[in-house]
Structures are given as structure tokens and as C-alpha cells.
Amino acid sequence: EEREVYTEAGFDEKEQAYFHGEKREESFTMEEIGEKENFIGDFGGVLYFYKISGNKKDQKRFYYKDFTGRVNLAKKFGGIKIYRDQFRVRPYGEYGDNDFDWLELSARRNRSPAGLGKENGNWRVGSEQILGTVSISRKNTNLEAAANRNGIQEGIGFSQLKRILLFVISEFERDRQFVGRKLARY
């Protein structure tokens, strides 16, 4: 079944290796991201995407995935959370809170509702399909705590952090849509 999917979808050997967990790393300069200056300094993070559900055709295409229980996973672990020096900065990524979707991924997806395998348009990930952490430190001087100690002060640093994260997410979306378009042929 696996070989059939690869062959009919047109995946080459390198793409098949990627399917089997070969890591792919990308790095970008601030200029490539569209930023003239780095206002926030170094930071790190990890983002994960997960498909919440799948119809019978999706289950055949994504034969290596189990979709059961994923909605509950989104409620428990979903969202992109921020940590400063290993301490959680609330409310970012808090399920059920207005700041769960602090990058406004759902609104962005609604403006571009293309399906993953569609040849036209740009597929966008939803806030319930992505989880992860962003790690900052007290050295990130332009990412100051808000006056009420709940969140980060809106300003040049926080705006830049959001733009950088959206750039990274859009690169992921482009890669994911490439795979989705190939699988749509199957």
C-alpha cells in the first residue's frame, strides 16, 4: 500500500525519505524573513502540526497516521505557548482563552480557505492544528512583561516575534501543501 501511494502520487526518493522521518532543517536570515533589524535577539522554539481528523480517503493517503482522539489532544496540549526562562508566560496558547490563537491563525485561514490538496490558493494551518513552545529569556529586552504581569507588552519586539513565527509557519504550510497536492493525485 505504501509503495502504491508513493508511486501514484509521484514522490521521488528524496521525498520518500522525508516521509520516513528524515529531518529537514531550514534557516533564514532576518533579511530573507523581511526584517531589517533584529529587535528581539535570540530565541528558540518547537512547533508541531497534527491533522485532527480524516475521512476514509485521507486515512488511506495518510496510512501511517492514527487520527483517533486528536481533538482532545488539541484541548489539552494545543496552542503555541511562550516560556521566559522556563516559566510559562500566560495567557498565550491557553485553550479556551482569547489568547489561545494569539497569532490569529484561524482568521488567516478564513481569509485563504484553500484545501490542502487544491491546486489553487494557499492552504493555511488552523490554530487547533498546531502546538508548540517559544522560548525567550530576560535577555530579550524588547519582549517585556506587560504591566499587569499577564503577557508580553505590545510593541516593536512582540510584533517582530509574531511576524517571524508567521513566516516560519508559512514555510511549513508551503511544504505541507506540496505534500498535500501530491497526495491529491493518489
Model-derived regions, located:
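Charged regulatory segments coupled to nucleotide-binding catalytic modules in large multidomain enzymes
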Residues: 6-10, 15, 20-186
